[in-house]
């Protein structure tokens, strides 16, 4: 384990217990932690302090998929492309249409992970009608800064068990906990898609069209 004045080192846990052990040791040394998937959005925001980088890239794989129930669970490091391909094979999709910002932020193309999508609340233009990524998240498994493994939410929307911690983690960029698995809603693919382009509209009319 490096001390706090040295450059970042990369850790890639392949199991929850490995992640817990890593965070436990990091906490002893009081080092800052940067959480990434494949690092496609590392170019966004302020550069982190040198410390330890934890990548969830080795925590991958779909753990549950029930097309008839419109629900899927996947480990955080599962590539978004793999998730979307499996959904498409069953005529389904992610309704919030996460886009690929890798090239725009200096990262690689096609490198997003499903955990990274929810950790950053990455949502496309369909969020206006379908809601953002956080609105589709049903539950999550995560490890906090005390190396404690916890689960929040479940596989159904009506899951009244107190605070919705899973949705609180969405958009937190890994600053609250490291998500290791996410469960989310999926939707049927539309039979057809039409794109409309309007130009030269006044602001009030443009807003009206969006809503």
Language model feature labels by segment:
Residues 42-48:
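Short glycine-biased active-site loop of nucleotidyltransferases that positions the nucleotide triphosphate
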Residues 2-35, 56-110, 118, 122-155, ...:
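N-terminal glycine-rich flavin-associated loop
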Residues 49-54:
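Short, well-ordered secondary-structure micro-motifs within conserved domains or adaptor modules
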Residues 168-190:
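Short, acidic (Asp/Glu-rich) active-site segment that either coordinates a divalent metal cofactor
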Residues 156-160, 166:
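Flexible, small-/acidic-enriched active-site or ligand-binding loops
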């Amino acid at each position: 384990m490096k001390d706090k004045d040295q450059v970042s080192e990369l850790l890639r846990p392949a199991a929850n217990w490995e992640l817990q052990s890593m965070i436990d040791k990091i906490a002893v040394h009081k080092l800052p932690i940067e959480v990434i998937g494949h690092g496609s959005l590392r170019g966004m925001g302020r550069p982190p302090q040198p410390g330890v980088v934890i990548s969830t890239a080795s925590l991958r794989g779909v753990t549950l998929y029930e097309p008839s129930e419109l629900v899927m669970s996947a480990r955080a490091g599962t590539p978004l492309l793999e998730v979307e391909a499996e959904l498409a094979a069953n005529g389904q999709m992610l309704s919030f249409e996460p886009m690929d910002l890798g090239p725009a932020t200096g990262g690689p193309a096609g490198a997003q992970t499903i955990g990274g999508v929810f950790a950053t609340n990455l949502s496309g233009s369909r969020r206006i009608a379908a809601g953002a990524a956080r609105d589709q998240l049903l539950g999550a498994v995560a490890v906090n800064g005390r190396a404690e493994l916890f689960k929040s939410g479940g596989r159904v929307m009506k899951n009244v068990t107190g605070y919705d911690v899973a949705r609180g983690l969405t958009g937190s960029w890994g600053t609250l906990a490291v998500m290791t698995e996410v469960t989310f809603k999926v939707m049927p693919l539309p039979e057809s898609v039409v794109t409309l382009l309007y130009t030269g509209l006044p602001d009030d009319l443009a807003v009206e069209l969006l809503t």
